[in-house]
């Protein structure tokens, strides 16, 4: 489901700008339970080049990340739109680890001039690229091309002609499967799916689909080719959005009845050692926007995640399923969140049981359809994402971003402290929990007169920031200053401004009813010290329904 963008005003804090916690003080078992499992990546974005347009596809081979889409140039990290541009026509290549722009830069031009799909051969020597283009560099092409990854040259022995847009490419050792909008390949009828040899010759594989193909994933040892898209009929039979075909003949193996309602479309398919994962988007009531896991060998569903918000890409990695979407209602998914009118554009889930893990980097919707991220790929331990977005973690960043394993960011929404002294010898501190993009449990350090007096750990998330309190015991009639800071165990925010409180000498007494506006006889007034503005629940940039 597509949503429109909402903006929230930053909350002004007068008192505490605290953040995050010391690893030595963090309760490891509490953190593990709250986070739900291991995550390979921090939520803190690495410096990354940007595109002057939309990224539709990415692929990785030999430590290089290839990027395709609709753009005329790229620009360095931190550069504003239109500044420091380097020409790259719908295709660019980067070092996966350093992010450095590489010289591999064939221009993809012609009708619609858009790169929609790419994937490397199993040995990493060839990059197959599909889309809507007529020329690659000086070579005439027809919507698909093969590049040598060693030198970025066009393979002239690979010359299939495809009549319309190629939206999915799946290379295997013996065949390259193509999916998209087309009706003919190399002069012969092929309805939206085809297979060619590594030399580009059309293979006998043939299937009939009534609407475009958008995702392909081959499991050759199991004799299966997973196909996803907009279709409702395959080979003359009902098969809505997802089907498994015989990779040699194109005959239907499995049709997955009941998995997807009408007006839903499978956009992405990926596999790990024994499972396949599918993501979909839909339009209108009763659609399916989430992710499904199934057994590769049998096609049996393992779990079904009903988060709403148009899934564009799924990527299993080290026991975690990463996804790009604009999730806005995951209330029925373990570890999920309710619909608050905003979006979360990246998710991480345990592959075993779909539980959402505490990993919440984010983007805005950005350009075009305002979907946000469109594609994910991992290379050399770095997660890359591309799409329509123009912001990452509420900072300007267009088209591309990436995440490594180093946690560099302090928690969001620092707590605002208030003090209350209503009885002799007691000071009560109150604040609302902060939250962090990749750590559920944060530790709060409380300082009295500049000295650490207590630490308290608490789990929180952007949709759930509980109120916290702590009562200090001090001498009656004394005067003290308090401050707070919060840490995620790696990064700690600056300590808050100190607040001062006077502690009563005697308990408050009420012996007679006072006149209006006068204090009670014998009563000593309690003191409450607060910032100018009370704490607010987390507000994030997001989107509303469209």
Task: State where each predicted segment sits.
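Extracellular mucin-like PTS domains
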Residues: 511-512
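Short linear segments in intrinsically disordered or otherwise low-structure-confidence regions
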Residues: 518-524
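Arg/Lys-rich low-complexity patches in intrinsically disordered regions that function as generic
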Residues: 539-543
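Extracytoplasmic surface signature
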Residues: 2-5, 9-16, 22, 26-506, ...
């Amino acid at each position: 489901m597509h949503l429109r963008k909402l903006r929230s005003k930053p909350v002004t804090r007068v008192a505490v700008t605290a953040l995050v916690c010391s690893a030595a003080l963090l309760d490891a078992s509490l953190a593990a339970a709250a986070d739900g499992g291991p995550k390979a990546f921090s939520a803190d974005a690495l410096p990354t080049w940007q595109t002057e347009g939309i990224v539709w596809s990415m692929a990785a081979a030999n430590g290089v990340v290839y990027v395709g889409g609709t753009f005329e140039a790229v620009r360095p990290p931190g550069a504003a739109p239109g500044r420091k541009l380097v020409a790259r026509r719908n295709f660019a290549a980067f070092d996966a680890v350093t992010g450095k722009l590489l010289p591999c830069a064939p221009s993809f031009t012609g009708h619609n001039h858009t790169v929609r799909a790419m994937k490397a051969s199993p040995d990493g020597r060839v990059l197959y690229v599909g889309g809507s283009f007529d020329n690659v560099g000086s070579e005439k092409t027809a919507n698909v091309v093969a590049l040598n990854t060693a030198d970025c040259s066009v393979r002239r022995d690979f010359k299939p002609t495809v009549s319309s847009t190629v939206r999915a490419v799946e290379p295997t050792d013996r065949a390259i499967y193509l999916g998209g909008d087309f009706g003919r390949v190399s002069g012969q009828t092929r309805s939206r799916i085809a297979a060619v040899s590594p030399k580009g010759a059309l293979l006998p594989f043939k299937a009939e689909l009534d609407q475009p193909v958008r995702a392909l994933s081959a499991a050759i040892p199991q004799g299966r080719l997973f196909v996803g898209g907009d279709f409702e009929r395959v080979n003359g039979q009902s098969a809505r959005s997802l089907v498994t075909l015989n990779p040699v003949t194109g005959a239907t193996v499995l049709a997955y009845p009941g998995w997807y309602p009408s007006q839903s479309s499978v956009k992405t398919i990926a596999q790990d050692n024994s499972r396949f994962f599918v993501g979909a988007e839909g339009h209108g009531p009763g659609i399916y926007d989430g992710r499904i896991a199934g057994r590769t060998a049998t096609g049996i569903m393992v779990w079904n995640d009903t988060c709403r918000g148009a899934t564009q890409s799924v990527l299993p990695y080290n026991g975690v399923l990463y996804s790009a979407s604009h999730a806005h209602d995951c209330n029925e998914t373990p570890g999920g969140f309710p619909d608050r009118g905003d979006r979360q554009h990246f998710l991480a889930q345990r592959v075993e049981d779909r539980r959402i893990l505490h990993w919440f980097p984010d983007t805005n919707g950005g350009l075009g359809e305002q979907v946000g991220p469109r594609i994910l790929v991992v290379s050399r331990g770095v997660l890359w994402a591309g799409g329509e977005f123009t912001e990452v973690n509420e900072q300007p960043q267009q088209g591309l971003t990436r995440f490594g394993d180093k946690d560099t960011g302090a928690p969001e929404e620092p707590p605002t402290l208030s003090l209350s002294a209503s009885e002799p010898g007691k000071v009560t501190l109150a604040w609302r929990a902060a939250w962090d993009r990749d750590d559920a449990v944060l530790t709060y350090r409380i300082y009295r007169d500049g000295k650490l007096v207590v630490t308290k750990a608490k789990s929180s998330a952007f949709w759930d920031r509980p109120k916290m309190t702590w009562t200090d015991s001090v001498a009656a009639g004394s005067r003290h200053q308090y401050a707070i800071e919060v840490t995620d165990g790696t990064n700690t925010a600056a300590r808050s401004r100190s607040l001062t409180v006077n502690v009563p000498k005697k308990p408050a007494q009420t012996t007679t009813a006072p006149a209006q506006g006068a204090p009670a006889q014998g009563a000593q007034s309690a003191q409450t010290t607060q910032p100018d503005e009370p704490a607010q629940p987390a507000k994030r940039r997001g989107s509303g329904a469209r």
